[in-house]
Amino acid sequence: MMFAQTTHPSAVGYTPPAPQMPPIAQPQQFAVETRGVTKRYGRQTVVNQLNLAIPSGGVYGFLGPNGAGKSTTMKMLLGLAKPTTGEVRVFGRDLRANRADILPRIGSLIEGPAFYPHLTGAQNLRIVADYLSCDKSSVDAVLDIVGLTDAAGKRARQYSLGMKQRLGIAMALISGPELLLLDEPTNGLDPAGVAEIRNLIVQLAHDRGITVMVSSHLLSEIEQMADIVGIIQSGHLRYQGPLSGLRDQGQLVMKVSPVNAAVAHLEALGLRPQSAGDEIILPPLRDDLIAEAVARLVGAGVRIARVELRRKSLEEAFLELTETPVVMPTSPQTTGRRGRA
């Protein structure tokens, strides 16, 4: 223990030390963390050494092609599937040891909504409210949040696909969760339905402070609503961070003639140019180095048609991550069932 040095009370100008205050509680930095989480079904590794870090608040986009391991991961976050190895922490606590306390604080919509088609939207929600011991007033509240108040008395079988998805989200919201997990919530919707669900997700996160994890295989959807993304392919987390971070620093491209002479002069400056047709490719350089390189080439009689910094588009970076093959390990296990990813 450390003690602050104080002046003796008899000293001139002595001021009693202020009482120490307890540290101010800091908000939980991550709503969800996984540490080395792996899931195997028999010899098949579906999720491999996954380290997610989902910040509290905002929208976390979980991107990956079909079968990449998105649904399996979300099931493990809900305790519906048990990790083969690794740890899942939700709200800073181990899920396995604190499941009964954690799960009531989570809402989810995994692999589509389930409801009684012959009952109305409101009746379906009352059943969920009864099961979760929620106040009946929450039914009207969530209907309003998802924009189904006018359709509350309509049978669920008469709902459009987009309305059914919103009903499923309403069911997930009825307990007032702090964390919402949505698995491909816009799958199969027309553009209007996609926009409705997207706007609802952003509203839940930014206006109501709910942490939302939403999975999708479409970059264009996640790009319009997520603050942070995790990209998974073949069970491996290939990238995690802001979407802007997917763009690399780019390449400095010079269109020159003659190319061979330009390469020789740039190498003399200590640079490492690569030629591609009538272009020279360099890593990004400081402005003063670019100016020096251009002056050297012009002085040597090399014609320069263009100098530009090229960056990958988000789509190019995403496709590069998700189309590169990943070798998955196999386990010597011979028992167990195969599961969906």
Give names to the regions the model predicted.
Residues 64-65, 78, 158-163, 173, ...:
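Short, structured secondary-structure boundary patches
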Residues 27-34, 39-233, 239:
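ABC transporter nucleotide-binding domains
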Residues 198-284:
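ABC transporter nucleotide-binding domain
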Residues 85, 101, 123, 138, ...:
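An acidic, carboxylate-rich microenvironment
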Residues 124, 164, 303-311, 328-341:
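Short, basic, helix/turn surface patches
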Residues 1-38, 324-341:
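ABC-family P-loop ATPase nucleotide-binding domain
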Residues 251-325:
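Short, charged/small-residue-rich alpha-helical element at the C-terminal edge
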